[in-house]
Amino acid sequence: MKLVIKNGHVMDPASGRDEVTDIWVEDKRIIGFGEHPEWEEDAEKLNADGCIAAPGLVDVHVHFRDPGFTYKEDLETGSRAAAAGGFTTVVCMANTKPIVDTPEVIQDILKRAENLPIHVKQVSAVSKGFEGKELVDFQAMVDAGAC
């Protein structure tokens, strides 16, 4: 599928791009910027006048409260809110119930996050039960997917 996003304010610090231009997308990948008249007939068009187009944002400190406090927020509602705000990746804190201090809890969270609209990362607690007495097995936590 071809898509042209018209007149978006493209802001990309990595490339130094900061301009209002068209964005050309094919099969969900950006393939170019500017005018491509040969595409105009075949491409779906999206008017982005007045909108900013930027790389996805990353929030390195979120509290989705899942597991344990899902009446406040859960992986689904938190990820949808993050996506609506332009975030494509979030890093969840470990102060849940149970506390994220075992590989099994990490694996459970990451498994449930697989089909969400954003990338969900999970940090590990430093000590078991947040008690500051015994360290978690950091290698096991990393092997389970903790960041």
Report the location of each language-model feature.
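Short, glycine/charged-enriched secondary-structure capping and boundary segments
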Residues: 19, 38, 71-75, 104-107, ...
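Histidine-rich, glycine-flanked metal-binding segment
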Residues: 1-4, 9-56
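Active-site beta-alpha loop architecture of Rossmann-like, nucleotide-cofactor-dependent enzymes
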Residues: 11, 65, 127
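Divalent-metal coordination cores built from histidine and acidic residues
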Residues: 79-147
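Active-site-proximal flexible loops/turns
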Residues: 14, 19, 66-70, 132
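Residues that line or immediately flank small-molecule/substrate-binding pockets and catalytic motifs
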Residues: 12, 61, 94
